């Protein structure tokens, strides 16, 4: 593959983000060759990610592109030349939200994404919400009794380390909160810790990961440690 002008422009940004090429499909190998695309480089995509593409991304749902941290969108002009559009509204690698909505099924979870304010809200389907509510009752760090969270203007979370099998973040929030991570949720293999203590990972927004985070400043890590 030869990089286009748009590719060269995007590659100057060395932060962590995703790129979406409007003319391509989710498995666009060219985009994945140069950038971290929403589909990745492998043809075998997680089924839920393909469904998200078909039902949301293909319909230009900007909120979903934002939650996937799509910072650059590659488009073509009338002459067929590619150009990169900067998406200033991308949610980033991780963010605190103010509210979780519970729905009854995966289908309803997908439908909720039609109008979800992904920067401030999350949606969890019933199967996952039962796990979530159970852990709220049994997790001693939790003082949460509902699904709304105070998010002060200084609340922050930043990505410190990014490797395929190890992610590290620093969070700071004066209130206990809930963080959505722009990383695909996988049921098996990934473990999350907050200050070294294992914490349950929730499946939010159909394809992403969520964590309940205590008040204060914390080191959060995800490690891929499959059981052999």
Q: Residue ranges of each PLM-predicted region?
A:
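Active-site-proximal, structured, solvent-exposed surfaces of multi-pass membrane proteins
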Residues: 71, 80, 128-228
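Extracytoplasmic
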Residues: 1-151, 174
């Amino acid at each position: 593959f030869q990089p286009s002008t748009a590719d060269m422009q995007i590659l100057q940004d060395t932060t962590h983000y995703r790129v979406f090429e409007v003319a391509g499909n989710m498995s666009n190998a060219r985009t994945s060759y140069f950038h971290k695309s929403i589909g990745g480089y492998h043809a075998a995509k997680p089924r839920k990610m393909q469904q998200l593409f078909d039902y949301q991304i293909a319909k230009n749902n900007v909120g979903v592109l934002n939650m996937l941290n799509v910072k650059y969108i590659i488009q073509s002009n009338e002459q067929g030349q590619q150009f990169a559009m900067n998406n200033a509204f991308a949610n980033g690698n991780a963010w605190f939200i103010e509210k979780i909505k519970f729905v009854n099924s995966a289908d309803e979870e997908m439908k909720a994404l039609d109008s979800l304010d992904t920067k401030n809200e999350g949606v969890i389907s019933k199967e996952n919400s039962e796990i979530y509510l159970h852990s709220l009752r049994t997790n001693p760090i939790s003082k949460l009794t509902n699904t709304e969270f105070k998010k002060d203007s200084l609340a922050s979370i930043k990505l410190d380390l990014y490797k395929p099998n190890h992610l590290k973040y620093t969070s700071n929030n004066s209130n206990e909160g809930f963080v959505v991570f722009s990383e695909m949720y996988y049921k098996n293999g990934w473990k999350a810790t907050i200050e070294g203590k294992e914490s349950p990972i929730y499946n939010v927004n159909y394809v992403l990961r969520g964590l309940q985070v205590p008040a204060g400043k914390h080191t959060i890590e995800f490690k891929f440690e499959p059981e052999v």
